[in-house]
């Protein structure tokens, strides 16, 4: 009887361990990097460095393809008559201990932008969370209003979970992210002009 109970306990323990491993693996798979892209950044006309970002294309393929193509500029001219390209656009909203926002290549002030699918596209899913600094997420004006604007977190921003689609993470260049963050203030208006002077895709 005692040996049967012991065997049952060991079986339950093994099952629990396997379940925990599987859950961890599933969580890691959500963050599997399928593409790498970069921004070369200038602050007030001076080179600040490169931000390299890994994109989670298996979890949010449509959102990732939008961002990737806007980094390369391969889609040409959009409906607004502007190049569908982050190159030359700025970080127009920077709030220390929160995030840096960019991607408005049509207006430059947070009122514009355009996706490769047309002006806006729907929220793909909210499987990924804003669990720390360096996460890449879609800026929006409410539900299903994704365009080209994005933000990079500089802290955990869990209150944005379920409201903004996370699709990538900075893999190198957080020092550059923090340099950009230092140009912000609580109003969000940058102290200096922060420009993405080049952007593109890198091999994995």
Swiss-Prot record:
GO molecular function: peptidyl-prolyl cis-trans isomerase activity
Tissues of expression: Ubiquitous, mostly in aerial organs. Higher levels in leaf and buds, and lower levels in seedlings.
Signal peptide from the UniProt entry: 1-23
InterPro entries: Cyclophilin-like_dom_sf (IPR029000), Cyclophilin-type_PPIase (IPR024936), Cyclophilin-type_PPIase_CS (IPR020892), Cyclophilin-type_PPIase_dom (IPR002130)
Entry keyword set: Chaperone, Endoplasmic reticulum, Isomerase, Rotamase, Secreted, Signal
Enzyme Commission (EC) number: 5.2.1.8
Annotated localization: Endoplasmic reticulum; Secreted
Gene3D superfamilies with a match to the protein in the record: Cyclophilin-like
GO CC aspect terms: chloroplast; endoplasmic reticulum; extracellular region; plasmodesma; plastid
PANTHER family per UniProt: PEPTIDYL-PROLYL CIS-TRANS ISOMERASE (PTHR11071), PEPTIDYL-PROLYL CIS-TRANS ISOMERASE CYP20-1 (PTHR11071:SF550)
Similarity section: Belongs to the cyclophilin-type PPIase family.
Protein name: Peptidyl-prolyl cis-trans isomerase CYP20-1
Taxonomic source organism: Arabidopsis thaliana (Mouse-ear cress)
